[in-house]
Amino acid sequence: MALKIACGQIEIIAGRPDLNTKKILHHMDMACQNGIDILLLPELAVPGYFLGDLWEQTAFIEDCAAYGDEIIAATENCGELCVIFGNIAVDNSKRNEDGRARKYNAAFAAQHGKLLTNGTLPYDFIVKNALPNYREFDDNRHFYGLRQLALELDKQVSGLHQPLTVTAHGETVKLGLMLCEDGWTENYFLDVPQLLAQHGAELLCNISCSPFSINKNSKRHRLFGSAAQKAGIPLIYCNNVGIQNNGKNIFTFDGCSCVYGSDGWLLTDAPMYAEATLCAGWDSKAKAIDTSGITSDPRSEIDEVYHSLRYGCQRFLEQAGIGKMTIGLSGGIDSAVTAALFVDILGPDNVLLVNMPSRYNSPMTQTIAEQTAQSLGANYTVIPITESCLHTSEQLTQTPIHSYHQHRDFQLTISPLIYENIQSRDRGSRVVAGLAAAFGGAFSCNSNKTELTVGYATFYGDICGALAPIGDLWKHHVYELGRYLNDKVFQRQVLPEAIFTIRPSAELSSEQTVGTGGDPLVYPYHDKLFRSFLEQWRKTSPVEILLWYSEGTLAEHLGCEADIISEAFPDARSFIADLEHWWKLMHTLAVAKRIQAPPIVSITRRAYGYDHREAQLTPYFPREYHRLKAQLLND
């Protein structure tokens, strides 16, 4: 008789061990009713993963341990069912390196009211070995890892990776149990899946709490499929769904749990962003796994982007208790896409769109804004800002300021740039914020990633709000998402065609018009340039950019068309001037603006916030850059 194994892809609510335990116990009941022998649940299924320094609160940790004990005790009434789940484990007799009680990111296997053990540790749980410390992960800040424990025990860490034997109804399987990062072997000297296989594991099980990013599933399939093939045994990957945040980044967890055969091929997978139970049968005689499921069709990149943003925004609003959104609608692509996204999530009656024209806003963008609101069926109003901005300007320039040091009065002057910022702040801090308070709910930040990179936003103006739904989208992503919303989501032209063809412009002065543009960014080039500074694992700098430019390989390295670069910059001098201009902007006031930006729904391999950590420094150009620059300008 085959053992029935189920992967419980559940939604985890970070910081709510009570709700998570209730859900786990429900899934255990369902597993019992359906004759499941082994139920896998995600990593840190009880507390959640991204909790900030809540990990330092003793009362919370004690609750997590108590809820874990409830789960263990509940297996006494579940027949042969073995439940494997992630939770924090605490050893109060020992200390972490920060002086606090010893904490482990651990996997527990419970059956008949007791914990199973592989006999290699002084504990009755499995300790996570690889504690990630990159991007949003900060595991060493809170947890003690297996490598540290091995050193303390004076043992080889490789010998501590042993399989866990589970028996049900007379059938036995040796599970190679791993926690998330232990299966991502590319950058670690220990190959945990292979060690487990060498030590007798018959089936690899990876329980994870792994956030989504674009193309991460492809990498996951490649790594885990390769691990299964190399070990010559099947692998089950169990992930959760839901959202979690670190204060500055909202991460979505896509689930996509799956089963790989011993040949590395994907046998079946769970849906994206949905709770599900993935089942498989283990033949202990044939040492083989069988699934009756099917695999999902691959999604396009923009399809993944849409579903991730929608899910992340929806869950964020639900958890925050926000049922209405107010959005400033300019007639441009960014605010239109944001508006369509929230209408899709909340329905048109719960979205208020406001156009706030000044004397610089063209009839064209005002018409586009109204057409967009009408097509979406949302609430709409127009509140002009010319008079209020002039009033603010007059107050600032005509009100005398007295110097008690110099014993004189003086007055301020308003430059064109200051007046541009007055308009932005009037729209954001006065109109949109006021409407949101009166309408109920919150308002959004419409900044995209390209704008955030160079600080194209105004403090307390357009860089405020409850969240930034498109803050991790480059400009080309925003246009693609707009097309997707028309074609796939609403299946009609809710975003007018003109919004895709009009020249981007802030419309804050007479020099910024939809006719002349006024936007110095060449998005097909600058999107790729800025992305190389931020998202490449080995971050580029002006040194690499100038080197590739001099070699004629820049377009190839950035992934853009060569003629775009040559048309935008006819000579080396103009290219260098542009490069230095944006590099300086990116590393000066733009950093402070990003620090103060609302939380970003994060979907790329590096998002601003606490995924890409920044200090407020001054721009720096390495010595090699100055050498290359001199060489290019003197040729």
Predicted feature residues:
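Enzyme catalytic cores with a strong preference for nitrogen-chemistry domains
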Residues: M1-G328, A339-N350, N355, S375, ...
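ATP/NTP-dependent adenylation/nucleotidyl-transfer catalytic domains that generate, transfer
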Residues: L3, V173, G232-I233, Q244, ...
